[in-house]
């Protein structure tokens, strides 16, 4: 049975035609062993342009269905403005997902708008009060799962415990056989470090996960592979993620070709799928607004794998 993937062509930092070309590359690459099909959401102008000028890019049987939208959510739109655009490409894609016409929905658009619209249209799991954005980052021991990286500015300690459970389910989808370890991102490793909310979260994580909870970890220890799952609030997590991306881009510019290909691959966040909006009953994935080329290519392939692995059902079973 084909995995149905919906993709919002609009609203990212690049032209919709750049996203289209990546989709063509995915369809031609045969990189996935999982049968899949795309449904695209775009303005009428872009739909016509693709069907008139790029019809020869793919065989007719592989050509994706394109759904016309009246408008799209821009990067500068507030979440409230996004909600008012009821027929935007993002809103239509989430409607299709909610109606079970899709197994996953991907957007490179406005993060705040995507999370807000997804919460409005897609039910949360009963045990979840807030969703979290989850990403994988490379480490010396493989990779770590980090959440939240931007969905919530501040969270309650009990919500952080829920984030850890969702991270465990995600690692299981990646085929981890061992029991993953959990760390709390903080300004120091000692138990007393951080705010009162951090200290309360520390105690709750220790009570819930026992020896699997390693305690507080600092930002640098994340890349050492100190923990398999790193829990944080969205404000701190977003700063951490964007700093990591900036450091890698800095190294690329400074070292250029001196970085060997295998090292570049290990460091490059573009080889990891986009952020998963965890806690929703259906799979929503946010790829970076600047994503193009290998970044979006691997984000889409990763999304296909997560949809096939029934990530949302696994998360639910981990929460109840």
From Swiss-Prot:
One MF annotation (Gene Ontology) recorded for this entry: phosphate:acyl-[acyl carrier protein] acyltransferase activity
Pfam families reported in the protein's UniProt record: FA_synthesis
Chemical reaction(s) catalysed: a fatty acyl-[ACP] + phosphate = an acyl phosphate + holo-[ACP]
InterPro entries listed in its UniProt record: FA_synthesis, Phospholipid_synth_PlsX-like
Matches recorded under Gene3D superfamilies: Isopropylmalate Dehydrogenase
Subunit structure, as described in the record: Homodimer. Probably interacts with PlsY.
Similarity-based family: Belongs to the PlsX family.
Protein name: Phosphate acyltransferase
Organism for this UniProt entry: Chlamydia pneumoniae (Chlamydophila pneumoniae)
């Amino acid at each position: 049975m084909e995995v149905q993937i919906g993709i919002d062509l609009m609203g990212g930092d690049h032209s919709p035609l750049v996203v289209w070309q990546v989709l063509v590359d995915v369809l031609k690459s045969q990189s996935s062993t999982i049968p899949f099909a795309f449904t695209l959401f775009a303005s009428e102008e872009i739909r016509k342009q693709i069907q008139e000028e790029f019809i020869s890019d793919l065989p007719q049987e592989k050509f994706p269905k394109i759904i016309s939208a009246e408008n799209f959510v821009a990067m500068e739109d507030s979440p409230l403005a996004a909600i008012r655009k009821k027929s935007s490409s993002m809103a239509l894609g989430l409607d299709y997902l909610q109606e079970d016409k899709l197994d996953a929905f991907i957007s490179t658009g406005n993060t705040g708008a995507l999370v807000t619209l997804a919460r409005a249209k897609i039910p949360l799991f009963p045990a979840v009060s807030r969703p979290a954005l989850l990403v994988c980052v490379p480490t010396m021991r493989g990779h770590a799962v980090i959440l939240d990286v931007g969905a919530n500015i501040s969270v309650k300690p009990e919500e952080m415990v829920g984030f850890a459970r969702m991270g465990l389910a995600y690692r299981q989808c990646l085929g981890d056989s061992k029991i993953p370890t959990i760390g709390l991102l903080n300004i120091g490793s000692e138990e007393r470090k951080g705010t009162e909310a951090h200290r309360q979260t520390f105690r709750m994580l220790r009570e819930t996960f026992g020896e699997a909870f390693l305690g507080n970890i600092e930002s640098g220890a994340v890349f050492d592979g100190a923990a398999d799952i790193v829990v944080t609030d969205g404000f701190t997590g977003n700063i951490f993620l964007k700093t990591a991306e900036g450091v890698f881009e800095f190294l690329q510019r400074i070292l250029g070709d001196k970085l060997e290909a295998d090292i570049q691959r290990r460091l490059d966040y573009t080889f990891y799928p986009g952020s998963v909006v965890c806690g929703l009953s259906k799979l929503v994935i946010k790829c970076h607004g600047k994503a193009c080329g290998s970044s979006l290519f691997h984000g889409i392939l990763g999304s296909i794998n997560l949809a096939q692995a029934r990530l949302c059902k696994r998360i639910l079973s981990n929460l109840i």
